[in-house]
Amino acid sequence: MNKPVVRFAPSPTGYLHIGGARTALFNWLYAKKNGGTFLLRIEDTDVERSKAEYIDQITDALSWLGFDWDNNVVLQSKNKSRHKEVVNQMIEAGTAYRCFLSKEELDTLRQESEKKKELFRVPKTYRDYSLDQQQALIDEGKAFTVRLKIPDGITEFSDLVYGTIKVDNKELDDFIIARSDGSPTYNFVVAIDDSDMNISHIIRGDDHLANTPKQILVYKALGLAIPIFAHLPMILGADKKRLSKRHAATNVQEYKEKGFTPTAIINYLSLLGWNPDSDQEIFNINELISAFNFNQVQKKPATFDEKKLLWVSGQQMARMETSAAVKEVESLDSNWGMNQDSKYKNDVIALVKDRSKTLNDLIEISDVFFKKSISYDEEMSKKILDDSSIQIVADLHEALNIEENWRKDALESIFDNLMTQHELGLGKLIKPVRFALTGLGYGPGIFDMMILLGKDRCLNRLSDAAKL
């Protein structure tokens, strides 16, 4: 088998969204697994909506995710002369023709069909006009579009996800490949660009299934090799409607800002439509490349669940090497741990990363180890530090103040005595203590945390909390 050449071809009309990132991932995984080539083409022919800032954001997001594309980025807008050249070749060859039906004429015909409750079909009035007849109409100043001459028969293709798909060409109109202003249409330029880039496998969302027969007809009209297709299942929100901003953040940049790592995003996206032959859900990148197979990609729409993403992220956070986690946090927040000893920072991250789901969690929890004092949230203080809780904090301060051995066993003994004194279980005892020491309602094990904070810092914070 020849090594595959795949492409990711986003339109720069917005930020890279979750669906686009999943498409890029599956292309990238397939190329990596099979020693192939992963290309990036920006489909920027929509002049009004395409923006340079979106191109930059898309390429930055792909780089952040680690999807290293081969060769230079291809801008579709740079291929305009090539597209026009092929349109003219097809007119000369008789595989396409100029259609002089105006928009107004087509609208009238469409309305007549609607009145009769008939399916509207574009008339093939000019399909068999000779080049001379077409030129005569041009000389009269008639505007025209260019349409593909669709032959009789069946268009059939084999999809790696959907299997064999057949479309009767009678169901298709002679569709436009160039508009009246000369600009080529999507299904035409995609086929030309994919052929010119030697794309062997087209991997994209299943919303493009309906476009595929049209693109195959363009390939056939030009005598071009037809690539292999794989259409990925749609991503839905929890309400089973297409994923949108009302369900969750939809672009990759937002998840980066929320503190998700590339590995967590990639791991979760891989599970949206792909079902490995095992119960394994947590993968590193090399494991994903090795395991990925289109035989396991499902037709059924995938449901995006941000809670599941958080769970995957937490699992990845726990597996991350401490030194790597420190680097990730420092790259996200340059002020994090400033003027702190590197060993202490590593010790802090090693302690808190198993309880964190994102890098933002890591920053929030670890920050309490660097502060001299804690700013307590007023609302949380009222809920957690009632009179009995304040007494627990005060009693703990008194016991710690006279304890000379700052060791885990000594702390455990003090807490045992407090449990007896206040007739409480450890969980209820820890809640106000944790809040007093960190200002948070969650975090690492209380004894390990206190050891790392140090006696003086613990005493000062307990004293501050007891005064609330």
Q: Which residue stretches match the model-derived regions?
A:
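Catalytic adenosine-cofactor/nucleotide-binding cores of aminoacyl-tRNA synthetases and other
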Residues: L222-I228, L232-Y376, T438-L468
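N-terminal Rossmann-like or analogous alpha/beta NTP/dinucleotide-binding catalytic cores
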Residues: M1-K115, N211-L224
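Glycine- and acidic
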Residues: V6-P12, L40-D44, M197-I202, D416, ...
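Active-site cores that bind ATP or allylic diphosphates and position pyrophosphate for catalysis
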Residues: R98, S102-H231, L236-L243, N251, ...
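Short, acidic loop-beta-alpha module within alpha/beta folds
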Residues: A21-L25, T263, G427
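C-terminal accessory/binding modules appended to enzymatic or scaffolding proteins
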Residues: D386-L437, Y442
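Short amphipathic alpha-helical segments and their helix-coil junctions
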Residues: M1-R7, V252, E287-F292, E330-W336, ...
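Residue-level signal for inorganic ion chemistry
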Residues: N27, I58, M90, G94, ...
